[in-house]
């Protein structure tokens, strides 16, 4: 599932770059729309424009790939530093944070004296 999503993101990114390059090169090179075929001048312009765009994209990607490990390493160090500053979560509440016990001594609830006598009983193994 994750692999398919990554492929879709890659395809989307490729299509965005392709569409941007096509739009940019067309606006720069297509001067005369009176003919069905591309003129020699337009063809050379399109070839030059596309080549420049592709070379620039390759240079940017190589710079990105070379910088990415250091960026990931720096982010991991930041996350670990932030995690070290977070106070640990208490698993059992302390006596200071315990809510007060409200008891009503009705006929069915045990009293403190009855509870104390139960805690004195021997525990079986």
Swiss-Prot record:
SUPFAM superfamilies: Tim10-like. It is found in: Mitochondrion inner membrane. Residues 87-125 are annotated as: Disordered. One of its GO terms (cellular component) is TIM22 mitochondrial import inner membrane insertion complex. GO terms for biological process: protein transport. GO terms for molecular function: metal ion binding. The keyword NAD does not apply. A motif (Twin CX3C motif) lies at residues 25-49. Residues 103-117 have a biased composition (Polar residues). Keywords: Disulfide bond, Membrane, Metal-binding, Mitochondrion, Mitochondrion inner membrane, Protein transport, Translocation, Transport, Zinc. Disulfide bonds join 25-49, 29-45. It is a peripheral membrane protein. Component of the TIM22 complex. Component of the TIM22 complex, a complex that mediates the import and insertion of multi-pass transmembrane proteins into the mitochondrial inner membrane. The TIM22 complex forms a twin-pore translocase that uses the membrane potential as the external driving force. Belongs to the small Tim family. The twin CX3C motif contains 4 conserved Cys residues that form 2 disulfide bonds in the mitochondrial intermembrane space. However, during the transit of timm10b from cytoplasm into mitochondrion, the Cys residues probably coordinate zinc, thereby preventing folding and allowing its transfer across mitochondrial outer membrane. PANTHER family: MITOCHONDRIAL IMPORT INNER MEMBRANE TRANSLOCASE SUBUNIT TIM9B (PTHR13172). This is Mitochondrial import inner membrane translocase subunit Tim10 B. It comes from Xenopus laevis. The lineage of its organism: Eukaryota, Metazoa, Chordata, Craniata, Vertebrata. The gene is timm10b.
């Amino acid at each position: 599932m994750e692999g398919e999503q990554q492929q879709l993101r890659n395809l989307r990114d490729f299509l965005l770059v392709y569409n941007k390059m096509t739009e940019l090169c067309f606006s720069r090179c297509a001067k005369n729309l009176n003919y069905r075929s591309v003129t020699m001048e337009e063809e050379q312009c399109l070839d030059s424009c596309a080549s420049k765009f592709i070379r620039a994209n390759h240079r940017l990607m190589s710079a990105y790939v070379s910088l990415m490990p250091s960026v990931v390493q720096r982010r991991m160090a930041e996350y670990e530093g932030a995690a070290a500053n977070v106070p640990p979560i208490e698993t059992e509440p302390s006596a200071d944070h315990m809510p007060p016990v409200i008891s009503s001594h009705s006929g069915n609830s045990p009293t403190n004296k009855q509870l104390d006598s139960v805690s004195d009983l021997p525990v079986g193994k």
